[in-house]
């Protein structure tokens, strides 16, 4: 009997141990649950880094925006992401195209529909024309509307106040007092400075600047003002005085024109060696003049060396990555970080600079450029950004630059 009782007790203990073993199973299933929130937190932080790193280094290497169609047909006839162009052509190889590339890349990567809208009347578009384009985008199903250029301001203030459920990204913009508008600006003076410094170090002594917007476009003014400062800094280091012709003529509409090409040709024929073409489609006229005179060009906004062998470098700003970053603020539920918040992207965001992938300068090296860029980032080199109009350059006190305003 005692043996039977002992056997029963032994079995009870075995079952108890088995029972203890089965209670351990839920503990094993609970571990992934405690880890999952940590896994979801990482993507939530990534958008803050994307504009300075990921879009610039990874996406261009794997996806070419030119391989993505400019137009698409959505299944429901609605388009979630819209782009309203600035004056000039959509495919201007510069400001409009760079911004739209950001729209296309983000939409394609995330399976979203997109569409571009061009205000009526081309380079003669009015604020009403721009508003109509924004209204069409909002009524066409847009959740995010990207508007390029400072001229969009008046129309955008009206459209955003009317379509409060739609988010608007204002590239080259400023605060409008509306939480559904994210203004994104750039430190173009830094990029212009780098370009001016580089070409003088390369040996150019007779330079030109042709700007768009008639001297009223803040971004173009900053480019030009920074360019003149960079030219002066390099000339001072080299102990030389250089010539800088400076003009806003024929660029008010940012378009190519026979008049602009004739003026650029005249500059080249009279000794100008290189012109900073700062104004969208104006680039085509200046390149044509440079090609005819065996001269050189500095591109703007994007790397324009792909368009012509006359381009020795380009003053860049990160239109593609900034556009993707701003759109993602909506889709990552982080709009509060940018809505009615003044955002200026510069060297410290890796948002301005010169293209090193297509470097063609021989006397001014990539290493020297990177050292100069680092000096801007750490504050050793300070660039004035107070340019309001072309007169600021004339009166800037640039001791080693002779400015000829035309």
Language-model region placement:
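A residue-level marker of the well-folded mature domains of exported/periplasmic proteins
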Residues: 22, 28-35, 39-406
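C-terminal motif of bacterial Sec signal peptides marking the signal peptidase cleavage site
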Residues: 16-19
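Positively charged n-region of N-terminal signal peptides that target proteins for export
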Residues: 1-11
């Amino acid at each position: 009997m005692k043996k039977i009782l002992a056997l029963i007790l032994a079995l009870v203990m075995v079952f108890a141990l088995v029972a203890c073993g089965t209670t351990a199973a839920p503990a094993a299933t609970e571990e992934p649950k405690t880890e999952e929130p940590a896994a979801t937190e990482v993507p939530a932080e990534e958008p803050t880094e994307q504009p300075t790193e990921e879009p610039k280094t990874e996406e261009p290497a794997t996806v070419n925006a030119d391989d993505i169609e400019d137009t698409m047909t959505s299944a429901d006839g609605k388009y979630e992401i819209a782009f309203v162009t600035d004056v000039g052509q959509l495919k201007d190889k510069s400001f409009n195209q760079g911004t739209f590339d950001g729209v296309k890349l983000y939409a394609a990567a995330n399976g979203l529909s997109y569409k571009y809208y061009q205000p009526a009347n081309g380079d003669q578009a009015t604020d009403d024309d721009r508003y109509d384009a924004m209204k069409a985008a909002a009524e066409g199903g847009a959740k995010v509307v990207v508007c390029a250029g400072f001229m969009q301001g008046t129309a955008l203030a009206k459209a955003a106040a009317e379509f409060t459920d739609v988010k608007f990204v204002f590239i080259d913009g400023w605060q409008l007092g509306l939480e559904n508008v994210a203004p994104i600006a750039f430190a173009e003076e830094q990029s212009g400075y780098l370009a001016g410094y580089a070409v003088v170090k390369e040996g150019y002594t007779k330079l030109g600047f042709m700007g768009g917007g008639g001297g009223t476009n803040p971004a173009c003014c900053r480019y030009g003002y920074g360019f003149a400062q960079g030219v002066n800094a390099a000339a001072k280091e080299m102990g030389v005085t250089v010539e800088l012709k400076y003009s806003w003529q024929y660029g008010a509409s940012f378009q190519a024109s026979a008049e602009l090409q004739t003026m650029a040709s005249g500059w080249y024929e009279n000794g100008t060696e290189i012109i900073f073409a700062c104004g969208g489609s104006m680039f085509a006229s200046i390149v044509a003049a440079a090609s005819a005179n065996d001269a050189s060009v500095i591109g703007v906004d994007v790397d324009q060396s792909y368009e012509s062998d006359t381009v020795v470098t380009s003053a860049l700003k990160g239109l593609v990555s900034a556009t993707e970053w701003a759109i993602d603020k909506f889709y990552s539920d982080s709009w509060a970080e940018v809505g009615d918040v003044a955002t200026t992207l510069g060297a410290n965001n890796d948002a301005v600079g010169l293209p090193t992938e297509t470097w063609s300068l021989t006397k001014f090296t990539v290493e020297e450029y990177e050292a100069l860029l680092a000096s801007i980032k750490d504050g050793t080199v300070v660039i004035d950004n107070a340019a309001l109009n072309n007169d600021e350059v004339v009166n800037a006190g640039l001791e080693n630059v002779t400015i000829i305003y035309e």
